[in-house]
């Protein structure tokens, strides 16, 4: 079993390549998708101005109000069903769900977050409807995998305490699921060839090397490296960070094109 995570830019620019490639893979697949650019498009169409915040670490992320959460759910559900229907039309036995369905991903809403304001100062604001995954109900995945070959998962989670779905980071969802079911391989696809140092792709990293390198590279990729290291240390065989915009993107990554994080 493998997990594949595709980022929002891959969803927008290279989705058909990914779907066709996954349809030709002879393995069980959990596909976790993003779609931030599409969420932004729909938000603006509905007359809602999207808000983004920057953390002290320099990571820019969507600030999800209750109103925008509704748009987020709508857009992610659309992406999910588009992917699932295309896979089914290619003869694959696929199902599309969100992380909130069946309580697959249980999360806690961030009550407050620290952001950098327009003056460059730290400020504490209400957390909105963004969450952090606290638990993965792996039995949901295990049961569905007895019935389906491919599970397409939207990055939503369930806040049991407040009985509401939450926007969660797609990478976080993919890493959490991978650790919980201890998959053979987690493939992270974005619009770059892998982890770049001085313009060149780093071919291979141990978890320890990944953690060390995370201190020296930019926001976004540094989080991927930290989560990759933790995943490998917790039972995932290997994590591969590669390009989602080339031909056969998943197969190419499985052929170890990109950055491979693995023990030893």
UniProtKB/Swiss-Prot annotation:
The record marks 5, 224 as: Transition state stabilizer. Substrate binds at residues 35-36, 62, 167. One of its GO terms (cellular component) is cytoplasm. Gene3D superfamilies: Acetylglutamate kinase-like. GO terms for biological process: arginine biosynthetic process via ornithine; L-arginine biosynthetic process; lysine biosynthetic process via aminoadipic acid. GO terms for molecular function: acetylglutamate kinase activity; ATP binding; N2-acetyl-L-aminoadipate kinase activity. Its main location: cytoplasm. It holds the Pfam family AA_kinase. Disulfide bonds: none annotated. Belongs to the acetylglutamate kinase family. LysZ subfamily. Involved in both the arginine and lysine biosynthetic pathways. Phosphorylates the LysW-bound precursors glutamate (for arginine biosynthesis), respectively alpha-aminoadipate (for lysine biosynthesis). PANTHER family: N-ACETYLGLUTAMATE SYNTHASE, N-ACETYLGLUTAMATE SYNTHASE, MITOCHONDRIAL. This is [LysW]-aminoadipate/[LysW]-glutamate kinase. The lineage of its organism: Archaea, Thermoproteota, Thermoprotei, Sulfolobales, Sulfolobaceae. The gene is lysZ.
